Regions:
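N-terminal cap/lid segment of alpha/beta-hydrolase-fold proteins
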Residues: 1-22
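The alpha/beta-hydrolase serine catalytic core
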Residues: 12, 107, 119-217, 221-223, ...
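Short beta-strand element of the alpha/beta-hydrolase
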Residues: 25-33
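Alpha/beta-hydrolase active-site loop signature
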Residues: 35, 62-67, 130, 227
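Short substrate-entry loop that stabilizes the transition state in hydrolases
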Residues: 35-41
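Conserved alpha/beta-hydrolase
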Residues: 43, 47-69
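Catalytic nucleophile-loop/oxyanion-hole region of alpha/beta-hydrolase
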Residues: 66-91
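Gly/Ala-rich beta-loop-alpha elbow adjacent to hydrolase catalytic centers
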Residues: 101-109
């Protein structure tokens, strides 16, 4: 059975997280995507990987996601970044970190570099989606949609079989978290993995992330016919292989 914990960050707010602690070991920190949670295949696969390889593991659900408290419509990149930092400070403490950022999780991970940079020893991005709120949502909204979201503060956006409530405050906050024009100087292993048939986020975003890093130890892996989530067994196998290369 998976052992979940809760971190109380205020009298009304708590963040659910999943932890495996191995003595003196580096932590793999998995950050999930937009409107996702820890019930998916990727966090479970990386938890098993950590157990097998005697590495510590941490994953969390941002406020308004999964079983963490709060409403999704009240959340934004700044709040979810802060949630992540608080849980890392509480759980990881002085151990080194290798980030795995899935989709929006890559954006949240990139934000951590200015906050806890000395502890970060590697980064694996999966279908990375930094700045997606402006570039992949707002810029594709019709004028009618833009007027509606400004007037009502929220719009329901259809994506496949799902409908997302997108708030104007979320869009505006995303603009305060621009990361693609920044530079990260640490010489760490950085690997971006992206599916060639990702219909949500174009491969160019993984390339943009690599440009942020001045490290010479960086690479892009494009998975032929891969989708956005890369959660099938054959793709999880590739992700675990790339993670092992980052660790070693």
């Amino acid at each position: 059975m998976t052992n979940f914990n809760y971190l109380k960050i205020s009298t009304t707010r708590k963040i659910r997280y999943l932890k495996l602690h191995q003595k003196n070991a580096t932590y793999i920190v998995f950050l999930h995507g937009f409107m996702s949670d820890l019930e998916g295949k990727k966090p479970q696969a990386f938890l098993k990987f950590a157990k097998k390889n005697k590495i510590s593991f941490l994953a969390l659900e941002y406020s308004g996601h999964g079983k963490s408290s709060g409403k999704f419509i009240n959340g934004n990149i700044s709040k979810w970044t802060r949630d992540t930092t608080l849980v890392i400070q509480k759980v990881v403490k002085k151990n080194d970190i290798i980030f795995i950022g899935s989709s929006m999780g890559a954006w949240i991970a990139l934000n951590q570099f200015s906050l806890i940079k000395n502890k970060i020893k590697g980064f694996l991005g999966i279908g990375s989606a930094p700045e997606f709120l402006d570039k992949l949502m707002w810029n594709k909204f019709s004028n009618k949609m833009k007027i509606e979201i400004k007037k009502k503060g929220v719009i329901n956006l259809k994506h496949g079989d799902y409908e997302y409530p997108i708030t104007y405050q979320l869009i505006k906050d995303g603009r305060k978290n621009k990361i693609l024009s920044k530079k990260i100087s640490q010489n760490i292993n950085v690997t971006m993995v992206h599916g060639s048939k990702d219909k949500s986020v174009p491969v160019i975003y993984s390339k943009k992330v690599l440009k942020i890093f001045q490290s010479k130890k960086k690479k892009l892996v494009v998975i032929k016919n891969g989708d956005h989530s890369l959660s099938s067994p054959k793709w999880l196998k590739i992700l675990k292989k790339e993670l092992k290369l980052i660790i070693n």
